[in-house]
Design a protein with these regions (language model features):
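Extended, highly charged
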Residues: 7-313, 317-319
């Protein structure tokens, strides 16, 4: 069952830090000698991925490439961070706990609440409900993610790595993809890799059983579906995107629970989605349900390449 004790495990007893943004987390890694920087140019095609792969396998530190080289030979204006959560200790630090089992127990309780236990001790359910309401996201007029707006959005200007030799192209591998249920307005945030097709086109690998695919079906082929891809942000926000949550708990609420404070969200500039305000990038756009393009191959985490397959195309309207 989920009880107020489970909540306290995360929010009181083993608190390490509540992260404001990714920068604060990286500074903490730097100060604890868990981060290295490479100041000379490193190619986004295979080279950066090769270095990160060696660090992961050795249990090495996180890394920032200050001068990632793009496909056209230019140096990107933006640094590239990799291997952020490559050890158990860094993962625990990112989540603000000493033992991730605490979070697992809470997630099990959220998915399988003990109704009988709550009926016997109704004040426990009330405390839990109040705690949940305090985790509701907070809407703000403008977020840090909108401090700079790319007037002519161009995905090829971002340091997106091609990690493996047979990959079909550069892939965003830690994206927070935000969509909205057109019937209820409920936002969903999932992690679906994105292949860069060009300046304003991205292939989105959401499978038929994912919420984003359900939203596209409900939108209908005659309408555009708004999409936003968020990069970076407080580490618990990234974790919430891959967590198996019950339908009545949003990723935004769970991110607030993990980070011990309400998640600030702000409205996109070119569509009506609300996104985490402290992420580093927001890529706004839309898909046209039914429009697909060949995505892949992609070297996946289980050690094999995913083959080419048809997936939705996102048209970028703002970065």
């Amino acid at each position: 069952m989920i009880t107020n004790e489970h909540i306290q495990l995360i929010s009181v007893s083993n608190v390490l830090m509540a992260w404001r943004d990714l920068r604060e987390y990286l500074l903490n890694l730097r100060d604890s000698d868990e981060l290295i920087r490479i100041s000379h140019p490193v190619d986004c095609y295979l080279e950066a991925g090769c270095i990160a792969d060696k660090l992961v396998k050795k249990g090495g530190p996180a890394i920032i490439f200050d001068q990632p080289r793009l496909a056209n030979g230019e140096i990107s204006k933006f640094p590239l961070a990799m291997n952020l959560f490559g050890t158990r200790e860094r993962t625990n630090k990112a989540l603000g706990v000493e033992n991730p089992k605490e979070i697992g127990e809470t997630m099990v309780g959220l998915m399988k609440p003990d109704i009988g236990g709550i009926l016997k001790k109704p004040w426990t359910g009330l405390e839990l409900a109040m705690q949940g309401m305090s985790m509701a996201p907070k809407k703000v007029r403008k977020g840090a993610c909108q401090a700079v707006v790319m007037k002519d959005p161009d995905m090829t200007k971002l340091p997106i790595p091609t990690t493996w030799p047979m990959d079909g192209g550069p892939f965003i591998t830690l994206p927070l993809v935000v969509t909205k249920d057109p019937k209820t307005g409920q936002h969903n945030m999932g992690m679906y890799r994105g292949q860069i097709f060009g300046k304003k086109e991205i292939g989105l690998h959401w499978q038929a059983h994912k919420h984003a695919a359900d939203h596209a079906d409900d939108v209908g082929k005659e309408n555009r579906m708004p999409v936003a891809i968020c990069l970076g942000g407080p580490p618990p926000v990234m974790f919430s995107a891959i967590s198996p949550l019950p339908d009545n708990l949003s990723e935004y609420e769970f991110a607030g629970l993990l980070n011990k404070k309400r998640l600030r969200i702000t409205k996109c500039l070119t569509n009506d989605l609300w996104v985490p305000a402290e992420v580093d990038f927001v890529i706004e756009g839309y898909t046209i349900p039914g429009e697909t393009r060949t995505e892949g191959p992609f070297g996946d985490h289980f050690g094999y390449y995913c083959l080419e397959e048809e997936y939705p195309v996102m048209h970028v309207t703002a970065i």
